[in-house]
Amino acid sequence: MKAIFIINPISGTGRQSSIKFLIKNQINKSIDYQIIETEYAGHGAKIAYENRDITDVIIAIGGDGTVLEIGAPLIGSNTPLGIIPAGSGNGLARHLNIPISLEKAIELINNHKIKTIDTVTVNGTPFLSTMGLGFDAHIAKCFDDYGTRGFWSYIKLIFREYFRYIPKTFDIEIDGTSFQKEAWIVCIANSSQYGNGAIISPESTIDDGQLDLCTLQKPNLLQTPLLIARFFIGNLHKSFLLSRDSGKNIVIRNHFELYHTDGEPATSDKELNIQINPLSLKVLIPNKNG
Protein backbone atom coordinates (compact mmCIF):
# COMPACT_ATOMS: atom_id res chain seq x y z
CA MET A 1 0.00 0.00 0.00
CA LYS A 2 1.22 3.48 -0.90
CA ALA A 3 0.34 6.23 1.59
CA ILE A 4 0.92 9.95 1.98
CA PHE A 5 0.76 11.56 5.42
CA ILE A 6 0.02 15.30 5.29
CA ILE A 7 0.80 17.23 8.47
CA ASN A 8 -0.40 20.69 9.38
CA PRO A 9 2.49 21.73 11.69
CA ILE A 10 0.51 24.53 13.38
CA SER A 11 -2.83 22.79 13.86
CA GLY A 12 -4.42 22.38 17.26
CA THR A 13 -2.45 21.40 20.33
CA GLY A 14 1.06 20.87 18.95
CA ARG A 15 1.16 17.07 19.19
CA GLN A 16 2.49 16.91 15.63
CA SER A 17 6.09 17.25 16.85
CA SER A 18 6.28 13.55 17.70
CA ILE A 19 4.29 12.21 14.76
CA LYS A 20 7.20 11.44 12.41
CA PHE A 21 8.91 9.35 15.08
CA LEU A 22 5.70 7.46 15.84
CA ILE A 23 4.97 6.75 12.19
CA LYS A 24 8.50 5.46 11.60
CA ASN A 25 8.25 3.11 14.56
CA GLN A 26 4.66 1.91 14.18
CA ILE A 27 3.71 1.82 10.53
CA ASN A 28 3.74 -1.58 8.85
CA LYS A 29 6.91 -2.19 6.84
CA SER A 30 4.76 -3.21 3.89
CA ILE A 31 3.39 0.34 3.59
CA ASP A 32 5.34 2.61 1.24
CA TYR A 33 4.82 6.07 2.72
CA GLN A 34 6.00 9.64 2.67
CA ILE A 35 5.34 12.50 5.10
CA ILE A 36 4.73 16.02 3.83
CA GLU A 37 4.32 19.12 6.01
CA THR A 38 2.07 21.87 4.70
CA GLU A 39 3.74 25.24 4.17
CA TYR A 40 0.79 27.56 3.54
CA ALA A 41 -3.01 27.70 3.61
CA GLY A 42 -4.38 25.44 0.89
CA HIS A 43 -1.16 23.47 0.50
CA GLY A 44 -2.74 20.32 1.93
CA ALA A 45 -5.55 20.49 -0.62
CA LYS A 46 -3.03 20.88 -3.45
CA ILE A 47 -1.04 17.85 -2.29
CA ALA A 48 -4.19 15.74 -1.93
CA TYR A 49 -5.52 16.73 -5.35
CA GLU A 50 -2.23 16.06 -7.13
CA ASN A 51 -1.84 12.62 -5.54
CA ARG A 52 -5.40 11.31 -5.30
CA ASP A 53 -5.13 9.14 -8.42
CA ILE A 54 -1.60 7.84 -7.84
CA THR A 55 -1.65 6.72 -4.21
CA ASP A 56 -3.72 4.26 -2.19
CA VAL A 57 -4.56 6.44 0.82
CA ILE A 58 -4.00 10.04 1.91
CA ILE A 59 -3.85 10.67 5.65
CA ALA A 60 -4.61 14.05 7.22
CA ILE A 61 -2.78 14.85 10.46
CA GLY A 62 -4.35 17.80 12.24
CA GLY A 63 -7.70 19.16 13.36
CA ASP A 64 -11.07 19.37 11.65
CA GLY A 65 -9.94 22.24 9.43
CA THR A 66 -6.98 20.23 8.18
CA VAL A 67 -9.16 17.15 7.67
CA LEU A 68 -11.58 19.24 5.58
CA GLU A 69 -8.82 20.82 3.52
CA ILE A 70 -7.25 17.46 2.67
CA GLY A 71 -10.50 15.51 2.44
CA ALA A 72 -12.33 17.87 0.07
CA PRO A 73 -10.18 17.04 -3.00
CA LEU A 74 -10.79 13.32 -2.37
CA ILE A 75 -14.58 13.65 -2.65
CA GLY A 76 -15.79 11.56 -5.57
CA SER A 77 -12.48 9.74 -5.94
CA ASN A 78 -11.55 6.15 -5.11
CA THR A 79 -8.75 7.23 -2.76
CA PRO A 80 -9.79 7.04 0.90
CA LEU A 81 -9.04 9.64 3.55
CA GLY A 82 -7.23 8.58 6.70
CA ILE A 83 -7.38 10.74 9.82
CA ILE A 84 -4.83 11.07 12.61
CA PRO A 85 -6.51 13.58 14.94
CA ALA A 86 -4.11 16.24 16.22
CA GLY A 87 -6.34 19.29 16.56
CA SER A 88 -8.38 21.04 19.21
CA GLY A 89 -11.76 19.40 18.62
CA ASN A 90 -11.37 16.44 16.25
CA GLY A 91 -15.13 16.21 15.72
CA LEU A 92 -15.21 14.01 12.62
CA ALA A 93 -12.62 11.62 14.05
CA ARG A 94 -14.65 11.24 17.23
CA HIS A 95 -17.86 10.61 15.27
CA LEU A 96 -16.10 7.87 13.27
CA ASN A 97 -14.64 6.32 16.46
CA ILE A 98 -11.09 7.04 15.31
CA PRO A 99 -8.79 7.00 18.35
CA ILE A 100 -7.59 10.36 19.65
CA SER A 101 -4.35 8.72 20.78
CA LEU A 102 -1.70 9.25 18.10
CA GLU A 103 -0.32 5.75 18.63
CA LYS A 104 -3.72 4.09 18.27
CA ALA A 105 -4.65 6.27 15.28
CA ILE A 106 -1.46 5.19 13.49
CA GLU A 107 -2.25 1.57 14.30
CA LEU A 108 -5.62 2.12 12.59
CA ILE A 109 -3.74 2.88 9.35
CA ASN A 110 -2.15 -0.58 9.66
CA ASN A 111 -5.45 -2.32 10.39
CA HIS A 112 -8.56 -0.61 9.05
CA LYS A 113 -11.66 -0.96 6.98
CA ILE A 114 -13.12 1.55 4.52
CA LYS A 115 -16.44 3.31 5.04
CA THR A 116 -18.13 5.57 2.48
CA ILE A 117 -19.73 8.68 3.98
CA ASP A 118 -21.89 11.58 2.88
CA THR A 119 -20.41 15.04 2.35
CA VAL A 120 -22.10 18.43 2.11
CA THR A 121 -21.73 21.58 0.02
CA VAL A 122 -22.65 25.14 0.90
CA ASN A 123 -22.88 27.30 -2.22
CA GLY A 124 -20.74 24.68 -3.94
CA THR A 125 -17.99 24.56 -1.30
CA PRO A 126 -17.68 21.21 0.50
CA PHE A 127 -17.60 20.39 4.19
CA LEU A 128 -17.66 17.07 5.99
CA SER A 129 -19.17 17.29 9.45
CA THR A 130 -21.07 20.35 10.72
CA MET A 131 -21.97 23.88 9.69
CA GLY A 132 -23.01 26.51 12.21
CA LEU A 133 -24.63 29.93 12.34
CA GLY A 134 -25.50 32.32 15.15
CA PHE A 135 -23.60 32.00 18.42
CA ASP A 136 -21.87 28.91 17.05
CA ALA A 137 -20.32 30.86 14.17
CA HIS A 138 -19.55 33.82 16.42
CA ILE A 139 -17.50 31.60 18.74
CA ALA A 140 -15.74 29.94 15.79
CA LYS A 141 -14.61 33.38 14.61
CA CYS A 142 -13.52 34.41 18.12
CA PHE A 143 -11.59 31.14 18.48
CA ASP A 144 -9.90 31.66 15.12
CA ASP A 145 -8.77 35.12 16.25
CA TYR A 146 -7.74 33.94 19.73
CA GLY A 147 -4.07 33.50 20.52
CA THR A 148 -4.37 30.18 22.36
CA ARG A 149 -5.82 26.89 21.06
CA GLY A 150 -7.29 24.00 23.00
CA PHE A 151 -10.51 23.03 24.75
CA TRP A 152 -10.26 25.46 27.67
CA SER A 153 -9.69 28.43 25.39
CA TYR A 154 -12.94 27.48 23.67
CA ILE A 155 -14.79 27.27 26.99
CA LYS A 156 -13.41 30.63 28.09
CA LEU A 157 -14.70 32.27 24.91
CA ILE A 158 -18.17 30.74 25.35
CA PHE A 159 -18.51 32.19 28.84
CA ARG A 160 -17.07 35.54 27.75
CA GLU A 161 -19.44 35.93 24.80
CA TYR A 162 -22.58 34.39 26.34
CA PHE A 163 -23.96 37.69 27.64
CA ARG A 164 -22.98 39.68 24.55
CA TYR A 165 -24.64 37.60 21.87
CA ILE A 166 -28.33 38.16 21.06
CA PRO A 167 -30.34 35.40 19.27
CA LYS A 168 -31.47 36.15 15.72
CA THR A 169 -34.38 35.20 13.46
CA PHE A 170 -33.45 33.06 10.46
CA ASP A 171 -35.40 32.50 7.22
CA ILE A 172 -35.02 28.79 6.46
CA GLU A 173 -36.21 26.46 3.70
CA ILE A 174 -35.96 22.66 3.87
CA ASP A 175 -36.82 20.66 0.75
CA GLY A 176 -39.16 23.43 -0.43
CA THR A 177 -40.86 24.17 2.92
CA SER A 178 -40.11 27.66 4.29
CA PHE A 179 -40.35 28.97 7.85
CA GLN A 180 -38.81 31.50 10.23
CA LYS A 181 -36.99 30.49 13.39
CA GLU A 182 -35.52 32.55 16.20
CA ALA A 183 -32.43 30.75 17.42
CA TRP A 184 -29.26 31.16 19.42
CA ILE A 185 -27.50 28.43 17.42
CA VAL A 186 -28.34 26.96 14.02
CA CYS A 187 -26.41 23.82 13.10
CA ILE A 188 -26.58 21.82 9.88
CA ALA A 189 -25.26 18.42 10.91
CA ASN A 190 -23.91 15.64 8.74
CA SER A 191 -22.23 14.01 11.74
CA SER A 192 -23.23 14.17 15.38
CA GLN A 193 -20.74 16.54 16.97
CA TYR A 194 -18.59 19.64 16.86
CA GLY A 195 -15.59 18.16 18.64
CA ASN A 196 -14.21 17.66 22.14
CA GLY A 197 -17.17 15.35 22.69
CA ALA A 198 -19.75 18.18 22.34
CA ILE A 199 -22.63 16.37 20.61
CA ILE A 200 -25.04 18.81 18.96
CA SER A 201 -27.06 16.25 16.96
CA PRO A 202 -27.00 12.87 18.73
CA GLU A 203 -29.24 11.12 16.21
CA SER A 204 -27.26 12.15 13.12
CA THR A 205 -25.59 9.48 11.02
CA ILE A 206 -23.03 10.25 8.34
CA ASP A 207 -24.20 7.85 5.64
CA ASP A 208 -28.00 8.25 5.56
CA GLY A 209 -28.28 10.81 2.73
CA GLN A 210 -29.89 13.35 5.06
CA LEU A 211 -28.94 16.66 6.66
CA ASP A 212 -30.12 17.41 10.17
CA LEU A 213 -31.06 21.01 10.98
CA CYS A 214 -30.73 21.70 14.70
CA THR A 215 -31.93 25.01 16.13
CA LEU A 216 -31.13 25.76 19.74
CA GLN A 217 -32.78 28.44 21.88
CA LYS A 218 -30.61 30.46 24.23
CA PRO A 219 -30.69 29.00 27.75
CA ASN A 220 -31.08 31.22 30.78
CA LEU A 221 -28.47 31.01 33.53
CA LEU A 222 -30.40 28.33 35.42
CA GLN A 223 -30.81 26.19 32.30
CA THR A 224 -27.19 26.50 31.18
CA PRO A 225 -25.51 23.85 33.42
CA LEU A 226 -27.97 21.14 32.36
CA LEU A 227 -27.66 22.14 28.70
CA ILE A 228 -23.86 21.89 28.87
CA ALA A 229 -24.16 18.48 30.52
CA ARG A 230 -26.53 17.31 27.77
CA PHE A 231 -23.97 18.33 25.11
CA PHE A 232 -21.33 16.05 26.60
CA ILE A 233 -23.59 13.22 27.78
CA GLY A 234 -25.06 12.96 24.29
CA ASN A 235 -28.76 13.55 25.01
CA LEU A 236 -29.20 17.14 23.84
CA HIS A 237 -32.09 15.93 21.68
CA LYS A 238 -34.10 15.48 24.90
CA SER A 239 -33.90 19.20 25.71
CA PHE A 240 -36.97 21.35 24.97
CA LEU A 241 -34.55 24.06 23.83
CA LEU A 242 -33.54 22.03 20.77
CA SER A 243 -35.64 21.61 17.62
CA ARG A 244 -34.65 19.23 14.84
CA ASP A 245 -35.66 18.90 11.20
CA SER A 246 -34.10 16.93 8.37
CA GLY A 247 -33.89 17.06 4.60
CA LYS A 248 -31.61 16.90 1.60
CA ASN A 249 -31.54 20.58 0.64
CA ILE A 250 -31.52 23.52 3.07
CA VAL A 251 -31.55 27.22 2.19
CA ILE A 252 -30.85 29.95 4.75
CA ARG A 253 -31.67 33.37 3.36
CA ASN A 254 -30.70 35.77 6.15
CA HIS A 255 -27.71 34.43 8.01
CA PHE A 256 -26.06 37.72 9.00
CA GLU A 257 -22.99 36.93 6.86
CA LEU A 258 -20.96 34.91 9.38
CA TYR A 259 -21.02 31.09 9.47
CA HIS A 260 -18.57 28.23 9.89
CA THR A 261 -17.96 24.87 8.24
CA ASP A 262 -16.15 22.24 10.31
CA GLY A 263 -15.07 24.99 12.70
CA GLU A 264 -13.56 27.21 10.00
CA PRO A 265 -15.22 30.68 9.98
CA ALA A 266 -16.46 32.13 6.70
CA THR A 267 -18.63 35.02 5.50
CA SER A 268 -21.10 35.47 2.66
CA ASP A 269 -23.63 38.16 1.78
CA LYS A 270 -25.61 35.68 -0.34
CA GLU A 271 -28.21 33.13 0.71
CA LEU A 272 -26.72 29.81 1.73
CA ASN A 273 -27.69 26.76 -0.33
CA ILE A 274 -26.71 23.58 1.50
CA GLN A 275 -26.93 20.18 -0.21
CA ILE A 276 -26.13 16.63 0.83
CA ASN A 277 -23.86 14.58 -1.43
CA PRO A 278 -24.66 10.96 -0.53
CA LEU A 279 -21.86 8.41 -0.15
CA SER A 280 -19.23 10.59 -1.79
CA LEU A 281 -16.07 10.14 0.33
CA LYS A 282 -14.21 7.02 1.41
CA VAL A 283 -12.62 7.12 4.89
CA LEU A 284 -10.57 4.73 7.01
CA ILE A 285 -12.28 3.61 10.21
CA PRO A 286 -11.40 1.05 12.90
CA ASN A 287 -11.49 -2.58 11.87
CA LYS A 288 -13.29 -4.04 14.87
CA ASN A 289 -12.56 -7.55 13.68
CA GLY A 290 -8.83 -6.90 13.44
Task: Outline where the language-model segments fall.
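Glycine-rich phosphate/pyrophosphate-binding beta-alpha loops
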Residues: 132, 187-200, 265
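Catalytic core of DAGKc-family lipid kinases
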Residues: 6, 76-80, 86-184
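Short aromatic-hydrophobic micro-motifs that form the base-stacking/packing surface
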Residues: 59, 82
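ATP/nucleoside-binding phosphotransfer catalytic cores, i.e., glycine-rich phosphate-binding loops
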Residues: 16, 174, 180, 205, ...
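N-terminal glycine-rich "phosphate-gripper" loop used for MgATP/nucleotide binding
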Residues: 60-65
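Short Gly/Thr/Asp-enriched flexible loops that form oxyanion-binding sites at enzyme active sites
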Residues: 66-77
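ATP/NTP phosphate-donor binding region
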Residues: 1-57, 177, 290
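A generic structural signal for short beta-strands and their flanking turns/coil linkers
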Residues: 166-168, 182-184, 207-212, 246-248
